[in-house]
Amino acid sequence: MASGILLNVKEEVTCPICLELLTEPLSLHCGHSFCQACITANHKKSMLYKEGERSCPVCRISYQPENIQPNRHVANIVEKLREVKLSPEEGQKVDHCARHGEKLLLFCQEDSKVICWLCERSQEHRGHHTFLMEEVAQEYHVKLQTALEMLRQKQQEAEKLEADIREEKASWKIQIDYDKTNVSADFEQLREILDWEESNELQNLEKEEEDILKSLTKSETEMVQQTQYMRELISDLEHRLQGSMMDLLQGVDGIIKRIANMTLKKPKTFHKNQRRVFRAPDLKGMLDMFRELTDARRYWVDVTLAPNNISHAVIAEDKRQVSSRNPQIMYQAPGTLFTFPSLTNFNYCTGVLGSQSITSGKHYWEVDVSKKNAWILGVCAGFQSDAMYNIEQNENYQPKYGYWVIGLQEGVKYSVFQDGSSHTPFAPFIVPLSVIICPDRVGVFVDYEACTVSFFNITNHGFLIYKFSQCSFSKPVFPYLNPRKCTVPMTLCSPSS
């Protein structure tokens, strides 16, 4: 009776973390008490793996370090308990068979039980292999010691798995938060046309985050339970090894087999390369286009216009602006061939070049065409890089003749100039372009090594107007501006504008 009471008292003053009698007990405001060293170590572990969260290891109620109080009453009980020992009579009863009252001296290998000599002769143990406890105690001590070492190793693996799953959980949270931030930033600049797509994509990300973190949280809980199970087994083995021979041998084979057959449950994880891609309709293409412009703008060069001897073109003093003095120019409708009655009509083409030649690398610039109802711009190749350019005699807007340009006529008709047929080598074919929002500013990007020329509608969030591919850059190319018959100037924008 007394031993049962003592066991109940001992349980009340046992640390839930180390499972030993409390040492320098500290109590939380939730009522649970822990060893000072144990709760301090738990606090440090929480700071490492739970981003500063402090909660009771038993009930998980949060606490503040300043609210922890020493529990002197419990400390006194522990001190008294350490002085109390079982009476000789109670100790003697523990060593005797509960059924026969005889001394427990034998060990039954088949049943893994400590028995008396009458038990050995009973039907229950007849034919079993029995040994004196002294004969097998050392053997099983070694086996349990080996099992303990194996279990400790598995505990380390379990703790590492627990730490890894927490780290992965935090990594996923950071990664998805980072993705959400980027998505929000991109949508902020495309707000007028992407409000619905942003909301939909963020909902998908939230669902993805919820599903992944829910699964990882479940795995984390399983890993915590697994680790706790390991601690309990280790505590049991340590108790056996430190206790009597009877404690050592009672059920020893079963626990050894259980430990030997134990396998650690691995958490379900998610590989980042298995993540879904943007699924919003057309959103990926829109964002890629926007990012293409963002990347192109990294190569913005400060383009100025070269002097020329064309009487119809007027270049401003800052060499950034060109306008037409003579409005006469020949321009056919989209979808038709560009023709001239005679070569003298070339004299009415008022195109001018940028002063910078492009022979390698990536180059980007922007042209302000606001309020103009006609213009041609892009790049051209093949002219001498001297101080004066005279290109009046050679304007034939075809890529095979060194022109990669787009144009506007009548205020709303946007076109790209492509190579004409072999029957009309001097007549480019004009293909209409679909432009939803008329650009006030056009970005031009040349990738010399990739042999591409791209045109962006800056007014419409950088949407791609047209892209020339497989350009034959056999000569240096130059920025090209032609204000055409419209007297409103074209202006080269500075990188800081």
Swiss-Prot record:
Region called Required for interaction with GABARAP and for autophagy, residue ranges: 187-200
Record SMART domains: BBOX, RING, SPRY
TM region positions: none
Keywords associated with the record: Acetylation, Antiviral defense, Autophagy, Coiled coil, Cytoplasm, Immunity, Innate immunity, Metal-binding, Nucleus, Phosphoprotein, Transferase, Ubl conjugation, Ubl conjugation pathway, Zinc, Zinc-finger
Binding site residues for Zn(2+): 97, 100, 119, 125
Domain called B30.2/SPRY: residue spans: 283-497
Molecular-function GO term, any one: zinc ion binding
Modified residues (Phosphoserine): 87
Principal subcellular localisation of the protein: cytoplasm
EC top class, as a word: transferase
Gene3D superfamilies linked: 2.60.120.920, Classic Zinc Finger, Zinc/RING finger domain, C3HC4 (zinc finger)
One of the record's GO cellular component terms: P-body
Zinc fingers (RING-type) by residue: 15-60
This enzyme's EC code(s): 2.3.2.27
Pathway: Protein modification; protein ubiquitination
Keyword presence, Cytoplasm: yes
Role of this protein: Capsid-specific restriction factor that prevents infection from non-host-adapted retroviruses. Blocks viral replication early in the life cycle, after viral entry but before reverse transcription. In addition to acting as a capsid-specific restriction factor, also acts as a pattern recognition receptor that activates innate immune signaling in response to the retroviral capsid lattice.
Assembly and interaction partners: Can form homodimers and homotrimers. In addition to lower-order dimerization, also exhibits a higher-order multimerization and both low- and high-order multimerizations are essential for its restriction activity. Interacts with BTBD1 and BTBD2. Interacts with PSMC4, PSMC5, PSMD7 and HSPA8/HSC70. Interacts (via B30.2/SPRY domain) with HSPA1A/B. Interacts with PSMC2, MAP3K7/TAK1, TAB2 and TAB3. Interacts with SQSTM1. Interacts with TRIM6 and TRIM34. Interacts with ULK1 (phosphorylated form), GABARAP, GABARAPL1, GABARAPL2, MAP1LC3A, MAP1LC3C and BECN1.
Comment, domains: The B box-type zinc finger domain and the coiled-coil domain contribute to the higher and low order multimerization respectively which is essential for restriction activity. The coiled coil domain is important for higher order multimerization by promoting the initial dimerization.
Protein name: Tripartite motif-containing protein 5
Organism per entry: Macaca assamensis (Assam macaque)
Species classification: Eukaryota, Metazoa, Chordata, Craniata, Vertebrata
Gene: TRIM5
